[in-house]
Design a protein with these regions (language model features):
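Short beta-strand-to-loop acidic/aromatic patch adjacent to the donor-nucleotide binding site
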Residues: 27-36
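Conserved donor NDP-sugar-binding/catalytic core segment of glycosyltransferases
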Residues: 41-72
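A recurrent flexible, glycine/aromatic-enriched loop bordering the glycosyltransferase active site
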Residues: 76-93, 155-158
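A short, conserved alpha-helix in the catalytic core of glycosyltransferases
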Residues: 97, 101-102, 107-140
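Acidic donor-diphosphate engagement hotspot in glycosyltransferases and nucleotidyltransferases
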Residues: 15, 42-44, 113
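Glycine-rich, basic loop-to-helix element that forms the pyrophosphate-binding segment
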Residues: 5-24
Length: 229
């Protein structure tokens, strides 16, 4: 099935289209992938072993990025754990639960779309299950590991427009869920991101302007009302 739009409506809108199709066609679970992601051959078979765990809304796995090193937080013999957040790509979504929670927030367009729905699900008592299993080869921007203030960090080298949405949506989601986020800490994170751009990325001025504009618009954007199904 190919669902087409006449214009770019954003990732959140497209995910809601998939959710609507799955719900109307009695599809119990559906897998979401980015265009540049490669999933392991046994991903669905592996995920299917865990779909009966009560309250699980999303199943995800460990991710390997093409450009930089990600730390494995799992203990050696740990089979899985419940987490608060996962990226959209490589996530197996429970159709009924996602529909009940109102799906994705179209106002986000792109970036933090995944974080928003994870928080929404958590607030309603549902869980995100992460498997100790390398299920996805992925690429976030053109990332690389760097040292900032003597600590290991990552810069993603996203273009200015993407930087705008990243900053805007971080502030918007923090406003949407004030019980989950400290706005003071979010603004500190944004300041750090700007410093990382200045120190390690190209097109610094355009990207910094975009992030500052994103922060301002994040405070202006009207909050989506929750679906109380």
């Amino acid at each position: 099935i190919l669902l087409k739009n006449g214009e770019n409506m954003g990732i959140a809108y497209a995910l809601n289209q998939i959710l609507k199709y799955a719900y109307e066609n009695d599809v119990k679970w559906f897998l979401t992938l980015d265009q540049d992601s490669v999933c392991s051959r046994n991903l669905i078979n592996t995920y299917s072993k865990y779909i009966e765990i009560p309250g699980v809304a999303i199943i995800t796995s460990c991710i390997k990025d093409r450009n930089y090193e990600l730390e494995d937080s799992f203990r050696e013999n740990e089979e899985y754990r419940f987490v608060t957040y996962c990226i959209t790509s490589g996530a197996l979504m429970n159709t009924e639960i996602c529909e009940r929670c109102g799906g994705w927030d179209n106002k986000l367009f792109i970036d933090n779309v995944d974080g928003d729905i994870c928080i929404n699900l958590k607030k309603r008592g549902y869980k995100v299950l992460s498997l100790h299993y390398n299920g996805l080869l992925h690429e976030v921007g053109h990332g690389k590991n760097v040292k900032f203030l003597w600590k290991k960090d990552i810069v993603y080298n996203h273009p200015a427009m993407r930087q705008y949405y990243m900053a805007r949506n971080q502030i918007y989601v923090a406003r949407k869920y004030p019980e989950e986020f400290s706005m003071y800490k979010q603004l500190k994170k944004e300041l750090k991101k700007i410093w990382l751009v200045i120190l390690f990325e190209e097109n610094k001025w355009e990207k910094c302007k975009a992030r500052i504009r994103g922060v301002k618009d994040g405070f202006r954007l009207d909050i989506k009302k929750e679906n109380n199904k």
